[in-house]
């Protein structure tokens, strides 16, 4: 399955990419309604570095999520993949492209939900809506930082 979210940011692509390189960028992008604890933070410029978080699925079921950085191509793209966590598979590309108004930030996620056919059946209701809300928040946080002078 695939999820894509885009936003136009009135800032240079280099600035948008630089936001993601901030030491606390990941923490800034966690929505306040999410119960997430960062156990280990990755350095996006280090291929193979891992972020480890603990969260709760549906607010109840604890889950440990390990994501490894697999690509780093500044100032255009970096990628992380789930090593272990709530999905059967997860690949997230963070893409920054030049745009006439500044930069286009595009998040592309390819994932396989848990629970096989049941997971695929409920993905549009539970997973897609959660991703939409979360990435709307993340993009707004990124936009505000990048457009601030």
Describe the residue ranges of each PLM region.
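Hydrophobic ligand-binding cavity/cleft-lining segments
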Residues: 1-47
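Short, surface-exposed coil-to-beta transition loops
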Residues: 2-4, 62-66, 89-92
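Generic structural detector for well-ordered beta-strands
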Residues: 6-10, 37, 54, 68, ...
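Beta-strand elements of well-folded, non-transmembrane domains
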Residues: 9, 57-59, 71, 86, ...
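A short, structured loop/turn motif at beta-sheet edges
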Residues: 13-14, 44-46, 71-75, 95-104
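Hydrophobic pocket/interface hotspot
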Residues: 15-20, 26, 51-53, 69, ...
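Glycine-rich portal/gate segments that line the openings of hydrophobic small-molecule binding cavities
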Residues: 38-84, 137-144, 148-149
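Beta-strand/loop substructures that line and gate deep hydrophobic ligand-binding cavities in soluble
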Residues: 81-133
């Amino acid at each position: 399955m695939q999820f894509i979210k885009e936003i136009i940011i009135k800032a240079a692509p280099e600035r948008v990419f630089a936001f993601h390189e901030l030491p606390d960028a990941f923490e800034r992008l966690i929505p306040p309604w999410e119960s997430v604890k960062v156990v280990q933070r990755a350095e996006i410029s280090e291929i193979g570095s891992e972020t480890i978080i603990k969260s709760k699925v549906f607010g109840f079921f604890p889950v440990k999520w390990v994501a490894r950085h697999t690509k780093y191509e500044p100032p255009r793209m970096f990628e992380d993949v789930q090593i272990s966590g709530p999905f059967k598979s997860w690949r997230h590309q963070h893409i920054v492209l030049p745009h006439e108004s500044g930069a286009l930030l595009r998040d592309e996620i390819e994932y396989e939900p848990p629970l096989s056919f049941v997971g695929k059946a409920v993905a549009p209701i539970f997973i897609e809506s959660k991703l939409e809300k979360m990435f709307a928040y993340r993009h707004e946080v990124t936009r505000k930082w990048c457009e601030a002078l």
